[in-house]
Amino acid sequence: MHTYPHKIENGEGEVLTFLGVVRDRDGDRTEIELLAPPDVGAPMHRHHLQEEAMTVVAGKLGLQCDGEQPRYAEPGETVILKQGVGHRWWNAGTTELRCTGWAKPPNNIEYFLTALFDSMKRGGSGRPGFFDAASLLTRYRSEIRMLEIPAVVEKVAFPVLLPLGTMLGKYDKFKDAPEPVMEA
C-alpha cells in the first residue's frame, strides 16, 4: 500500500495521482487525478470488475467505447464507464488534459497501473516490456484486459514468456504483487 497522494508517470507525459480510497455506502472507490498531453491516452481495454468515472477539469477528453463512434467531453462533463465495457480514452485537445475520477471498487488498479507505468517508463517506447506485460496481464486477467493485444499473443506467446521470464528473474520485482480479485 502506498502513502497518498501516490503519483506515477509513464514516460510519455501521462501522470496519474492516486489520492486515496474513499469509503461510502455504495462501496470503496479509488480517487484519481489525471494529466495527459495532447494525443496521449490509454489503449482499448476492459475493466471486468470495476466501474470508472472521469470528470474533465481542463482540456478535451476523447472517448471511444467498444463498437461505438468516438465522443468527447469538455470541462465540467463527467463520463461514467460501466464494468465490462471496452473503452479507450485520449487527450483530444491541443492543451493538457486534466481530469479527476475514480475506479470502484479499487481492486488492484493502483498496483497494476503503477507496475505498468514503471515498465513503460523503463522501456522508453511508450509500451510496457514484453515480460512485464505477459506477467501483469496474465496475473490480473480477471480484472482487466487490453483489447488491442491479439488473442494469439495471450494464448501462445504469454505462456511461453512466463516460464522463460521466471527462469531469467524478470518477475522478481513482482514478488509482493497482491493476489488478483476474482469475480464473486
Task: Name each model feature, range by range.
Residues V57-A58:
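A cytosolic small-molecule/anion-sensing beta-strand core signal
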Residues M1-R29, G41-Q50, L63-A184:
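Jelly-roll (double-stranded beta-helix
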Residues E31-L35:
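Short amphipathic
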Residues M54:
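Structured binding elements
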